Amino acid sequence: MKVTVSHLDEMRFEAKTERGQSFVIDCPVISPIEYFLAGLVACTTSDLIAIPKKQGKTVTGLSVEGDVVRNETAPCKFNTLHLDYRFDSDADDTAALRWVMGSIETYCSTINTVRDTTKITYSVTHNGKLLRENEEIISGQGADVDFGEIDACCSN
């Protein structure tokens, strides 16, 4: 994977991917660290559409909120990350939890990039029912959760 960032003007930059796509980073409107967090949350959110779809299931009303606490002084790295998953589906609660864990433990590249240096917790509300609240991810190494190949945005 390769991305090239070029200065446009003032504090605006253009990011281009090796696949030819581009977007503008407009600091300080949205900071690079906010883009990073948004990318992390988008990665796991896309998994929560792709994994169920592969199993013939449908997810609706999906929302994932990422809340980070960072160092107050440089380097202002992530210390803690909490992910709050809320969605409805035509599957049972066990399947819904497996989808979340599949994303967290295996498929989401961005979560797995920060997991060794960041305390990560998560909550899951499925079909209006709170299934997990502030559960800590303790493995630190990912796990062999295999739903096969999925077509999610972080697969490339």
Task: List each language-model region with its residue ranges.
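Extended beta-strand/beta-hairpin segments
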Residues: 1-38, 49-156
